[in-house]
Amino acid sequence: MSEGYLRHLLSEEIADLEMNGCTADNWENIKVASPFHAEHVCNVHFSGSVALGLFEKEFTLPGGVKKHSGIRNATLHNCKIGDNTLIENVHNYISNYFIGDDCFIQNVNVMYVEGRSSFGNNVEVSVLNETGGREVPIYNGLSASLAYLIALYRHRPALILRLQAMIADFAERQTGNYGFIGNHVKIINTGTVSYTHLRAHETSAH
């Protein structure tokens, strides 16, 4: 979704949303892509800054059931929703997430990020022995060979320090206040999704 074509809601669109059971702390903080079709947004509460993409496509489910993209039965707080995404039956809320295009999110309890998070990057994990001393900082790009170097080349302290600094720098660049759900992600029948970055085409289902 490009922010270049987002706009504020028109008064008649707000009226349509309210007829659909939607509420907002402040409608001025809600932006939408054009054309906006309010009929695809029902029983949603908005708070904070929320941006909505287009709702123009349908999803075909196993058995031939079709569901139109849109948002139904959810609370959104400080979120950006991409084009042609379906969010349906969020029992609590989604807070501080950027959600990509063509995502399918259904029957989720809660999704949130609170405060700054590195999303698991640069978290040290003990390896080889349970008493510590050979911790490896994990991060998104960690390979088996790099973990081997960090764990077993402690006799090369300069090398270890450089690798640790590289990982710390990567983690700092990943740190932020918003979680990220990539394009074409499916999250179905899931309890809590917190402090998460999901890449495109991933699936979380229980």
Predicted features along the sequence, with ranges:
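Terminal amphipathic alpha-helical/low-complexity segments used for targeting or macromolecular assembly
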Residues: 1-184
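Conserved small/polar residues in nucleotide/adenosyl-binding loops
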Residues: 196-203
